[in-house]
A protein has these predicted regions:
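Alpha-helical transmembrane segments of multi-pass membrane proteins predominantly involved
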Residues: 1-186
Length: 186
């Protein structure tokens, strides 16, 4: 996210969307392995597979959708749009890129500070996911407001959706499939 704030090249923004898609894929893959219903020994037990079938279907949907849509389909479509429009840079930002980098770093730091506040009611929330996702959402909203090109705004919106998806993984463990369906509708 900090790199997206620091550069004006749209191809680099699209490449960062690909990296975000792969990172979200690995977060989903490792995050679901910590779920109480998931156990490596259930692979050989057909009764355990049938008992956890709704969880397995949701897990497979989230994994496949994250990898295919977020890491391949949307970035490849945006690369094609960047090539056809010959819009290679967004140099019309309201704020110079150094200040964008500085403000994005402050937002990321503030996200980690907020995530590590010791409130007993928030113990169910994963602080790493919460801190990163809140920083991604706020930075994306901020970048959408200061950029002028439509492609930069679309990339900011998709990055914000990635942050919302990560936020749903940290807060609502049972509902990432609903969040993914909402993102697919966008």
């Amino acid at each position: 996210m900090i790199y997206i704030a620091a550069t004006s090249r749209l191809a680099a923004h699209v490449n960062m969307l690909i990296a975000q898609g792969w990172l979200l894929f690995f977060v989903c893959l490792t995050g679901f392995a910590k779920e109480p219903w998931f156990n490596w020994t259930m692979i050989s037990n057909s009764d355990a597979i049938m008992a956890n079938m709704p969880h397995i279907i949701g897990f497979l949907f989230v994994i496949v959708e994250t990898l295919i849509v977020k890491a391949f389909v949307i970035p490849l479509f945006l690369k094609k749009v960047v090539k056809k429009t010959h819009a290679h840079r967004d140099t019309d930002a309201n704020i110079p890129h150094f200040y964008c980098l500085f403000i994005s770093s402050i937002i990321l730091f503030a996200g980690f500070l907020v995530a590590n506040i010791d409130i007993p009611e928030l113990k169910l929330i994963d602080p790493m996911y919460f801190g990163v996702s809140s920083a991604i959402i706020i930075t994306s909203l901020w970048l959408i407001t200061i950029k002028h090109k439509v492609l930069s705004n679309v990339i900011g919106f998709i990055t914000m959706e990635n942050g919302i998806f990560l936020f749903s993984l940290s807060v609502a463990k049972e509902m990432p499939i609903i969040v993914n369906l909402g993102v697919l509708l966008d």
